[in-house]
């Protein structure tokens, strides 16, 4: 018997019944980015592959339109 109980991951988008991920929904997109600006993998978040692909496309679109930065702020 193990000491730790690992909670089962679930896809938030499937649970909420989302059809498509919007690139303008910055609050949702930021939940799936690290503090450095990288996209968090689906094995960590539990997102299904269909929504992970949509998420990656939405993040890349919003980066291109300068809605979110490509990386964190650098001190040069």
Curated annotation (Swiss-Prot):
GO terms for molecular function: small ribosomal subunit rRNA binding; structural constituent of ribosome. One of its GO terms (cellular component) is cytosolic small ribosomal subunit. It comes from the Bacteria. GO terms for biological process: translation. Keywords: Ribonucleoprotein, Ribosomal protein, RNA-binding, rRNA-binding. The keyword GTP-binding does not apply. Pfam families: Ribosomal_S18. Part of the 30S ribosomal subunit. Forms a tight heterodimer with protein bS6. Belongs to the bacterial ribosomal protein bS18 family. Binds as a heterodimer with protein bS6 to the central domain of the 16S rRNA, where it helps stabilize the platform of the 30S subunit. This is Small ribosomal subunit protein bS18. It comes from Xanthomonas oryzae pv. oryzae (strain KACC10331 / KXO85).
